Regions:
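Short, highly charged, low-complexity non-transmembrane loops/tails of multi-pass membrane proteins
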Residues: 263-292
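Non-catalytic, surface beta->alpha helical segment in thiol-disulfide oxidoreductase systems
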Residues: 9-40
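Cytosolic juxtamembrane amphipathic/interface segments immediately preceding
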Residues: 52-67
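Hydrophobic cores of alpha-helical transmembrane segments in multi-pass inner/ER membrane proteins
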Residues: 179-182, 243-261
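N-terminal signal-anchor transmembrane alpha helix
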Residues: 68-98
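Extracytosolic (periplasmic/ER-lumenal) interhelical loops and adjacent juxtamembrane/interface segments
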Residues: 93-170
């Protein structure tokens, strides 16, 4: 209750801080009148709420558990989500091509998997960018495939070989996004969820704008059917990692504290319910014991 005590809850009515005996009597009488009216009307939803309010079910237990462990659950899921794409080239290298292809196909749903925008394992280089990226001292994608034209469908399906290595199942930017989002989640948990929410306008400036500029400015470079005045560019692996990390960290910084506010309300509500139900059960046991004497 954020220090606003004492607090008295009488049915749907809540009295905070200093309140008079009259206010308490009015709230109690109103709650009883409301209970009588709803019971007389035979409101089924009310009866269900009353029954649910004096019992603890599995959904309550799961909701309470999830409200406490949601950061670890989501961050662990994201960590596994980012690890699996790296298993694809490992499996391909070790001869388990069927398993590797399943991973490639599953992640194809969420990622373009363009060969010139992906990382590689077990090859001469960790990436093979397009010539348009103007990165000196690296083998380009065009040199690998032996063609100066870009076939997008072929680039998506291209996995690699023993010489250049095998492609990770998601692109460079997605690796940075999901990896940094998972990392921020673990950091948020280690700080006991005390990191304050990033304002939406800072999220927009820090997280969204850079990735939008870097990503959308590459679109003309995928086709030759653009006017001459349209700038043609290709981003670099470093820029993709930077903008992806900014988006992942910024989104986690904005999202997790906001989720914590909602989860905190859930924990308080359920903790109060558990306390009430336990008190009712103790009272019932005491009454039953005294009755049996």
């Amino acid at each position: 209750y954020k220090g606003q005590t004492p607090v008295v809850c009488v049915g749907p009515y809540v009295l905070r801080n200093s309140f008079t005996d009259t206010e308490l009597q009015v709230a109690t009488r109103s709650a009883f009148e409301r209970q009588t009216r709803l019971s007389t009307e035979g409101d089924e939803q009310y009866e269900k709420r009353v029954k649910n309010g004096v019992s603890i079910n599995n959904l309550d237990r799961f909701s309470y558990f999830f409200s406490r462990a949601y950061v670890i659950i989501l961050s662990t899921f994201l960590a596994l989500f980012i690890i699996v794409p790296f298993l694809a080239p490992i499996l391909y290298k070790t001869g388990h091509k069927t398993s590797a292809n399943i991973i490639y196909k599953v992640y194809h749903v969420i990622c373009h998997q363009l060969a010139f925008r992906s990382f590689y394992l077990f090859g001469e280089q960790p990436y093979y960018p397009r010539e348009l990226a103007n990165i000196n001292g690296v083998i380009t994608y065009e040199q690998v495939v032996g063609s100066s034209s870009i076939d997008l469908e072929y680039a998506r399906a291209f996995i690699g070989n023993n010489m250049i290595g095998y492609k990770v199942a998601i692109c460079e930017r997605d690796v940075a996004i999901y990896g940094s989002l998972a990392l921020f989640g673990f950091i948020f948990q280690l700080t006991k969820k005390k990191i304050k929410q990033l304002p939406w306008y800072l999220w927009f400036i820090i997280a969204l704008v850079p990735i939008a500029i870097d990503g959308f400015s590459q679109i003309p470079g995928l086709s030759s059917n653009w006017p001459a005045w349209v700038p043609i560019r290709e981003s670099t692996p470093v820029l993709r990692i930077i903008t992806g990390t900014l988006f992942g960290v910024g989104t986690g910084w904005y999202m997790y504290p906001m989720m914590e506010e909602s989860m905190k309300e859930t924990r308080v509500t359920l903790h109060r319910k558990f306390a009430i139900v336990n008190k009712l059960n103790q009272t019932k046991k005491l009454v039953d014991h005294e009755t049996s004497l």
